[in-house]
Amino acid sequence: MDIFISKKMRNFILLAQTNNIARAAEKIHMTASPFGKSIAALEEQIGYTLFTRKDNNISLNKAGQELYQKLFPVYQRLSAIDNEIHNSGRRSREIVIGIDNTYPTIIFDQLISLGDKYEGVTAQPVEFSENGVIDNLFDRQLDFIISPQHVSARVQELENLTISELPPLRLGFLVSRRYEERQEQELLQELPWLQMRFQNRANFEAMIDANMRPCGINPTIIYRPYSFMAKISAVERGHFLTVIPHFAWRLVNPATLKYFDAPHRPMYMQEYLYSIRNHRYTATMLQHIAEDRDGTSH
């Protein structure tokens, strides 16, 4: 969590470095629309534009480049101070878990909320990479990292790294009750699937291939940066179906929506909890995740 860095400063730096609103927004698990509005609000506040916009491209203009050169060293210093305070303040009292930001949004939101539900736990988004796993865990920046992505054999063989497999996460489909009388396999083929933007980076397509292609189903998958509730609303209206984790079924209205599994057998997504070997809170963290998904957390 940023302490001294303002949201406008952070968003400006991210956009300057990525030249893409959607990618910049993904890094902090925002959707593109509010991120773009924050940049427009910044430009309005200072009284001049910072970016050149052409079609889908965006880049710093001359004024933006000058501001970036002045601001980036300040941003780096403040970021270092934020990290120092965060790390020193939490070492004695908190477990910090990094949540892979490629998770489907509803799963990401459930995991990030562990920090609100369990005393002594802080959850924060991370951009998953093999080097990031090594650096964050071995340098004690994070106690745990949870991800649907598996590291290579090179990293698996590190002596001080532990990889705990979580119970496979059951995934199914949500569709409007107006299709109550239709065959589920027909709906999977005919209705477009509406998914969050982040899911196409979390081995989602590979999972779909493994489960759908053998059934002869070739879905049309549409990725949109919707919130969970916006996605559910679109499904309720009958325009789409969508994939959700089974634990999220209790969060929607069963009078208007129907849950069903994939043909022949349910789909499952594997997850991994990374930590330093013999971390004393590994079992505790695994229990927190399981309880929260079962709906038995305190």
From Swiss-Prot:
Any one of the GO BP annotations: regulation of DNA-templated transcription
InterPro entries associated with the record: LTTR (IPR050176), LysR_subst-bd (IPR005119), Tscrpt_reg_HTH_LysR (IPR000847), WH-like_DNA-bd_sf (IPR036388), WH_DNA-bd_sf (IPR036390)
Keyword DNA-binding: yes
Key words, A-Z: DNA-binding, Transcription, Transcription regulation
Domain HTH lysR-type: 1-61
DNA-binding span(s): 21-40
Gene3D superfamilies noted in UniProt: Winged helix-like DNA-binding domain superfamily/Winged helix DNA-binding domain
Record Pfam families: HTH_1, LysR_substrate
GO molecular function (one): DNA-binding transcription factor activity
Family: Belongs to the LysR transcriptional regulatory family.
Family annotation (NCBIfam families): station_TF_SrsR
Name the record gives this protein: Uncharacterized HTH-type transcriptional regulator YgfI
Gene name of this polypeptide: ygfI
